[in-house]
C-alpha cells in the first residue's frame, strides 16, 4: 500500500526525499491518520517486520529543528529517525509516544502541586535541550505533551524555529492563543523566554484548570507562574535552568 503524500512529488530525480519515500513505501504500512490540517498530515505507521509503531509527519516547514533532534536522546523528547525535505515539504519519521495527552488527562482531573512539579521539571529538561541548540518550541501546550507512564514527553515541533542572531520580529506568527507569549504576535523576535511564558500557563492549568489571567495558582507555584507569564520577557526567568531552580 503506497502512502498518499500531500503536495506534488517529483520522483524523476534521485534525492534523499525520494529515497525516504521509497523506504517508507517498502518497509512500513499506514495504520491511521493521527492528525490532518491544511499544512500537515500525521500518520501512524507500523514497521512491516518488527511490528513497531512510528509517526510520520508530512508537512510544510524547515527541517533544521528535526535534524537537530536526530542528534539528541531524551526520555522527554521523541526520537527522530529520518528527515527529508523537498520544495518546502518535509517528511519526518519519529518515535511513536504511547500515552495520553496532558490535555485529555486534565479534562478528567487537576494535578496536585507535587505531581505538577514533577511534570514541570521534566518539561524544563526537554526545553533545556531544545534551547541548548538554539531552538524555540513556540507551541508548548497540554495537547503537545504526552504522559508516557511517569514521563512527560514534549511533541510537535512544526511551529518551532531556530533563534536568529538578528531581526526584530518573527516572520511567521505561530502558536496557540492563550498559551503563546505576547511577542509571538509579531511584536518582537521570540527567544527561549517565549517557551517559559507558555510553560507558566501550562503549569497554572495543571493546578487550577484556568489561564492565570482568570485564576492564579496559590502560594509558591502561583509566584512561579506569575513570573513566567510577565508580558515583558525581561521580567520572566532568563532560562529554564533558573526556572527549574525555582521549582
What are these model-predicted stretches?
Residues 30-67:
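ATP-binding glycine-rich loop module of kinase domains
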Residues 73-82:
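Conserved HxN/HPN-centered segment at the entrance to the catalytic loop
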Residues 87-101, 105:
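Conserved short submotifs of the Hanks-type protein kinase catalytic core
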Residues 131-147:
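Catalytic-loop of the protein kinase fold
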Residues 169-183:
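Conserved activation segment of eukaryotic-like protein kinases, specifically the C-terminal portion
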Residues 195:
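Conserved catalytic-loop aspartate of Hanks-type protein kinases
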